[in-house]
């Protein structure tokens, strides 16, 4: 479960975006943004196996796409944090900014927050106060049909293999560290076995030779 895509836009004008993996996010997002009214509101659209959560405030839309089993409370917690950071950084400049004007700077913020809210499951317990629960109850979920320019039904296509490069690097690093740890553990175990064996042999020989100085076995 993860936040797959995030975007900040003014109407249909995209100001900043970030994708966790490959997909036709922009094609789908353009249709979603066109359906969002300009007044302040919050809503979740449902389409297939995906959810589109957004907050619209002062004509600026903060939107993210998640799997349908991703907690909505975490999605809106992410959007609220993105909104706060975006407003603090840009303020009224967003009302007249050109397309992608903030992308070079703010896409890294989206990436960091996307990763944080996707991975930190403790947010549910820490941040989901009763007020947030009540607020979430007031945010509706609506089904939405998307149509491509050719008139065909538009589906969100996700290619998570694009994110497997980072995952494979992490896996290799983890495997290497695990192998190193297992090797050290085996070395320590071997040393302990050798020491115990030597002590055991010494005790047996001492018993057979009449004592720890081996008086019956050592010639004077």
From Swiss-Prot:
Parts of the chain on the Cytoplasmic side: 2-188
Residues that bear Phosphoserine: 167-168
InterPro entries: Longin-like_dom_sf (IPR011012), Longin_dom (IPR010908), Synaptobrevin-like (IPR001388), Synaptobrevin-like_transport (IPR051097), V_SNARE_CC (IPR042855)
Membrane topology: Single-pass type IV membrane protein
UniProt-listed SMART domains: Longin (SM01270)
Function: Involved in the targeting and/or fusion of transport vesicles to their target membrane during transport of proteins from the early endosome to the lysosome. Required for heterotypic fusion of late endosomes with lysosomes and homotypic lysosomal fusion. Required for calcium regulated lysosomal exocytosis. Involved in the export of chylomicrons from the endoplasmic reticulum to the cis Golgi. Required for exocytosis of mediators during eosinophil and neutrophil degranulation, and target cell killing by natural killer cells.
Vesicular side: 210-220
Residue ranges constituting the Longin domain according to the UniProt record: 7-110
Misc: Loss-of-function mutant (antisense inhibition) displays impaired receptor-mediated phagocytosis.
A GO CC annotation given for this chain: phagocytic vesicle membrane
Modified residues (N-acetylalanine): 2
The protein, known as: Vesicle-associated membrane protein 7
Principal location class: membrane
Keywords attached to this entry: Acetylation, Coiled coil, Cytoplasmic vesicle, Endoplasmic reticulum, Endosome, Exocytosis, Golgi apparatus, Lysosome, Membrane, Phosphoprotein, Protein transport, Signal-anchor, Synapse, Synaptosome, Transmembrane, Transmembrane helix, Transport
Subcellular location: Cytoplasmic vesicle, Secretory vesicle membrane; Golgi apparatus, trans-Golgi network membrane; Late endosome membrane; Lysosome membrane
Assembly description: Component of the SNARE complex composed of STX4, SNAP23 and VAMP7 that binds SYT7 during lysosomal exocytosis. Component of the SNARE complex composed of STX7, STX8, VAMP7 and VTI1B that is required for heterotypic fusion of late endosomes with lysosomes. May interact with STX17. Interacts with PICALM. Interacts with RAB21.
């Amino acid at each position: 479960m993860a936040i797959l895509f995030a975007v900040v836009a003014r109407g249909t004008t995209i100001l900043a975006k970030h994708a966790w993996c490959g997909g036709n996010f922009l094609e789908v997002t353009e249709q979603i943004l066109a359906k969002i009214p300009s007044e302040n509101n919050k809503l979740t659209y449902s389409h297939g196996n995906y959810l589109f959560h957004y907050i619209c405030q002062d004509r600026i839309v903060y939107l993210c796409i998640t799997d349908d089993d991703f907690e909505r409370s975490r999605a809106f917690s992410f959007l609220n944090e993105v909104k706060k950071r975006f407003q603090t950084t840009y303020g009224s400049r967003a009302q007249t900014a050109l397309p992608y004007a903030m992308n070079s700077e703010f896409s890294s913020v989206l990436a960091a927050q996307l990763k944080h809210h996707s991975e930190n499951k403790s947010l549910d317990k820490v941040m989901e106060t009763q007020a947030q629960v009540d607020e979430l109850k007031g945010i509706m979920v609506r089904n939405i049909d998307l149509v491509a320019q050719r008139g065909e039904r538009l589906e969100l296509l996700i290619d998570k293999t694009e994110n497997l490069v980072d995952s494979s690097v992490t896996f290799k690093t983890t495997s290497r560290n695990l192998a190193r740890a297992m090797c050290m553990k085996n070395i320590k175990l071997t040393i302990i076995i050798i020491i115990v064996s030597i002590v055991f042999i010494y005790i047996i020989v001492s018993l057979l030779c009449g004592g720890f100085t081996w008086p019956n076995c050592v010639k004077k």
